[in-house]
Amino acid sequence: MVKFIALITAAGSGSRMGEDIPKQYRPLAGKPMIYHALRTLCGIARISTVCIVLAPEDTEWIRHNWREFAGKIQIFNCGGATRAESVTNGLKALRAANHVQDQDWILVHDAARPGLSTTLVERLLDQLADDEVGGLLAVPLADTLKRADDAGRVICTEPRERLWQAQTPQMFRMKLLLEALEKAPAGITDDASAVEALGLSPKLVVGNAYNFKVTYPQDLKLAELILRERAIT
């Protein structure tokens, strides 16, 4: 039977946050940031395993209590210098541990997207389980885009029709994803880009604005509000 396996990338340093600890461990709504996505993914019955890819030198993970997820999580200290390297290393570690088959689905998620909801994950699974390629959560672009010159002057306004903002999870079969990442050009920033480079067209599944990536310190307040509101409702 084909399995669904989640893989959370958590090997980054979070340098843009200006913190002494990696961003994924930054306290958020009373828990480390990574906890919120981990809880959502572990709560999905169709997902058999949630793998967390940490940096080899990570010392923060063991400082926290993860017992509630025992039996469903797998830790790999094999993160690389880039997101693509971390995902590639995680997939190879899964294969070496005999936890995955070529046709199993892999859902790659960023630890810094704590606003991921059960509804979004279930929607992704429903819409992609029988897809030939796979796909990703994304939201149609709402903001007006300006292209600038080197002096910070507007060159033109870019049309936003058919433009989407990529989110995670991004879901592809194990064999395809590993092949795509191993052949990917330098500088790719997500898994879908690697698959696109093979000439394939991933499917866009509508996400929502709550599933944004926490990147800068000011993002933390918004993420905190979202998570606390969710806890109340």
UniProtKB/Swiss-Prot annotation:
Coiled coil: none annotated. Keywords: Isoprene biosynthesis, Nucleotidyltransferase, Transferase. The keyword Transferase applies. Pfam families: IspD. One of its GO terms (molecular function) is 2-C-methyl-D-erythritol 4-phosphate cytidylyltransferase activity. Gene3D superfamilies: Spore Coat Polysaccharide Biosynthesis Protein SpsA, Chain A. The record marks 16, 23 as: Transition state stabilizer. Its EC number is 2.7.7.60. It comes from the Bacteria. Catalyzes the formation of 4-diphosphocytidyl-2-C-methyl-D-erythritol from CTP and 2-C-methyl-D-erythritol 4-phosphate (MEP). This is 2-C-methyl-D-erythritol 4-phosphate cytidylyltransferase. It comes from Nitrosomonas eutropha (strain DSM 101675 / C91 / Nm57). The lineage of its organism: Bacteria, Pseudomonadati, Pseudomonadota, Betaproteobacteria, Nitrosomonadales. The gene is ispD.
